[in-house]
Amino acid sequence: AQRTAAPAATEAAAEESTEAAAPAVSADGKIAMITDSGDITDESFNQITWETCVAYGDKNGIEYQYYKPAEDTDEERINAIDLAVADGASVIVMPGYLFGPAIAEEQDLYPDVSFIAVDVTEADIVDLSGNAVGISDNVYICSFQEEQAGYLAGYAIAKDGKTKLGFLGGMAVPAVIRYGYGFVQGAD
């Protein structure tokens, strides 16, 4: 995994926060964001996840850093998690279903670290052999209903009078497939 320096939250940014509620993350720790196989400038999941970590860190005076696995493998995602924890991360944010096996392997090794998995479902949390693994209390997953956005897009284009339609997704991954199904149903 590759450490990538990120600017630390400034004192000025911490002073600007006027909210009375305490941040969900202790200022003693650090937020780590690990990219899947992309980069934080991909204009997609990695970038928006990184920008959100930066905004949260700046607002709450919490350090942040991102890590990019050396290769697109479960082992390298695990190595990136280990590196982030060694660097003091108390929260690790991971965008994408590819993190399922890494979470399954690491969640119990670091019970004091909060893992936030974006666009990951319980079905994605499998060990390196593909066996389903339960989610520990320190893991928070959120997934999207891409088919709803796809449905609305399909409906809108059909309502606009377009009848000769097609759908081309970037890759045949679960999120894109769900979006495509929704698009076709909305256009129908």
Functional labels for PLM-detected ranges:
Residues 1-188:
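A residue-level marker of the well-folded mature domains of exported/periplasmic proteins
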